[in-house]
């Protein structure tokens, strides 16, 4: 029987993909507005290359962007990018549709909830606290704090140990087939692939590790009912 439900954070509970793209575009526009002597498409393309190389949690994207563009360091331009990026994040941060209702219902049904996410602990906690969903979760496991990223089994085992449950008693919900689904399945958890955001059509070679697939987070409730024997309408992933 499932007792604990783990969620990924980005594009599982928090609508991250759309937010990040908007924030980056606004950052470049604000840098140009304050004197960056480069056209938007060139600057944005270089920024995306930087993110691809260094990851989205790298703290010096805008500093390195100036180097990539063969421009001298200018704190005004960097500050303009940082301010616009964070202002956009704060203004447009949203939950994935239906997330809060699902969390409320799962708590009402007596399930214990946790988060297993990759990323910078301060940035991830900022999202959780700004959306005021922290009270739903007993434990939040974040890769950069633990020293190991998904899909490494250690981070999933750490989460199971925190809840003192066996893998068969836990279910992982995430948007990434490789890091979330493959990783959780390898330690024995049940898995639900949430087909949302930029990874909904990627990493399909790991699709076989998903026990279920859902396109709306609300459908997780049917999955849970099916797993615990009270609903036979949900069908496992193909």
UniProtKB/Swiss-Prot annotation:
Cofactors that this protein relies on: Mg(2+)
InterPro entries: HAD-like_hydrolase, HAD-like_sf, HAD-SF_hydro_IA, HAD-SF_hydro_IA_CTE7, HAD-SF_hydro_IIIA, HAD_sf
PANTHER family xref list: GLYCERALDEHYDE 3-PHOSPHATE PHOSPHATASE, N-ACYLNEURAMINATE-9-PHOSPHATASE
An example Gene Ontology molecular-function term: phosphatase activity
Recorded family membership: Belongs to the HAD-like hydrolase superfamily.
UniProt KW keywords: Hydrolase, Magnesium, Metal-binding
Protein's recorded name: Glyceraldehyde 3-phosphate phosphatase
CDD domains: HAD_Neu5Ac-Pase_like (cd04305)
Enzymatic class: hydrolase
Any one Gene Ontology BP term: small molecule biosynthetic process
Function: Catalyzes the dephosphorylation of D,L-glyceraldehyde 3-phosphate in vitro.
EC nos: 3.1.3.-
A Pfam entry, by short name: Hydrolase
Native source species: Pyrococcus abyssi (strain GE5 / Orsay)
């Amino acid at each position: 029987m499932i007792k604990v439900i783990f969620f990924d954070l980005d594009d599982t509970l928090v609508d991250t993909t759309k937010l990040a793209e908007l924030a980056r575009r606004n950052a470049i526009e604000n840098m140009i507005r304050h004197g960056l002597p480069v056209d938007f498409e060139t600057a944005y393309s270089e920024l995306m290359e930087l993110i691809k190389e260094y990851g989205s949690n790298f703290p010096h994207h805008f500093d390195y962007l100036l180097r990539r563009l063969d421009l001298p360091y200018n704190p005004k331009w960097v500050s303009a990018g940082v301010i616009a990026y964070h202002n956009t994040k704060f203004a447009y941060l949203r939950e994935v549709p239906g997330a809060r209702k699902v969390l409320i219902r799962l708590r009402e049904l007596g399930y214990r909830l946790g988060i297993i996410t990759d990323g910078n602990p301060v940035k991830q906690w900022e999202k959780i606290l700004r959306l005021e969903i922290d009270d739903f979760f007993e434990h939040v496991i974040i890769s950069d704090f633990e020293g190991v990223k998904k899909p490494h089994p250690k981070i999933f085992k750490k989460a199971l140990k925190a809840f003192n449950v066996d893998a068969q008693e836990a279910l992982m919900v995430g948007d990434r087939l490789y890091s979330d689904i493959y990783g959780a399945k390898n330690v024995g958890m049940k898995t639900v692939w949430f087909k949302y955001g930029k990874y909904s059509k990627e990493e399909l070679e790991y699709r076989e590790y998903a026990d279920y697939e859902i396109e709306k987070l609300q459908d997780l409730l049917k999955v849970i009912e099916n797993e615990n024997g009270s609903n036979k309408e949900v069908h496992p992933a193909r």
